[in-house]
Amino acid sequence: MNGADLRIGIAGITGRMGKLLAEAVPLAGATLAGGIGRDGDLAALARESDVVIDFTVAATVSRHAGILAAAGTPWVLGTTGFDPAAEADIADAAARIPVFQAANFAPGVNLVIALAERLGATLAAETHDAEILEMHHRQKIDAPSGTALAIGAAVARGRGVDLAAVKDSGRDGHTGKRETGAIGFAALRGGQIVGSHSAIFTSAVEQITLTHHALDRRIFAEGAVRAALWLAGRAPGRYGMRDLLGL
């Protein structure tokens, strides 16, 4: 299916990202099938759409997974901050429909994620401490950001460990010395910062920093629409920016 024939629906069209998506869809040569707010009729939207892009809230993810799987409609999911139960529901949906999930749709930040994994594999945890720093606008409701967690997970994969076993995001007060192999997180909030992420590797003799600054929220909308165009016609399964970018 070419872009001109592709009907894209937007869940969360009344939000900041949803409005940008509504502008980005026709610019990419696709057709805007319609959109709903977080409490709208997703089943009806799914019937009118070849792909649904979802930027709503974490509490809706499980319900949306069931509705879109039942409708057979491919799903581009940009919502973050959901719990393990919702993650399981996404996996169940991916057995029936193609699901494209990303914490961040900017190509550049996904290159940072790929490089973070490479550095995690190359720089020993015993010599190089890994810290993830992120800053976002004051309205953001989850921390660390989904992108920060994705960067941390990439470092952990490179080191052959599970992020949950080494994640340190609660430093406050008398914490004691830093644990060898820990992956630390710090989240800053203020103003209207679109999104800044850094992966910092520090040893006794050097420091390596990977940084990405998003300057305009349109980069996320354009990436999500690109993902929708790519996802249409794919087999059921889970896909992400690595697949889209060939990383």
From Swiss-Prot:
GO terms for cellular component: cytosol. Keywords: Amino-acid biosynthesis, Cytoplasm, Diaminopimelate biosynthesis, Lysine biosynthesis, NAD, NADP, Oxidoreductase. InterPro entries: DapB_C (IPR022663), DapB_N (IPR000846), DapB_N_CS (IPR022664), DHDPR_bac (IPR023940), NAD(P)-bd_dom_sf (IPR036291). It is found in: Cytoplasm. GO terms for molecular function: 4-hydroxy-tetrahydrodipicolinate reductase; NAD binding; NADP binding; oxidoreductase activity, acting on CH or CH2 groups, NAD or NADP as acceptor. The keyword Amino-acid biosynthesis applies. CDD domains: DHDPR_N. NAD(+) binds at residues 12-17, 78-80, 102-105. It comes from the Bacteria. The active site is at residues 136, 140. One of its GO terms (biological process) is lysine biosynthetic process via diaminopimelate. (S)-2,3,4,5-tetrahydrodipicolinate binds at residues 137, 146-147. Its main location: cytoplasm. Pathway: Amino-acid biosynthesis; L-lysine biosynthesis via DAP pathway; (S)-tetrahydrodipicolinate from L-aspartate: step 4/4. This is 4-hydroxy-tetrahydrodipicolinate reductase. The gene is dapB.
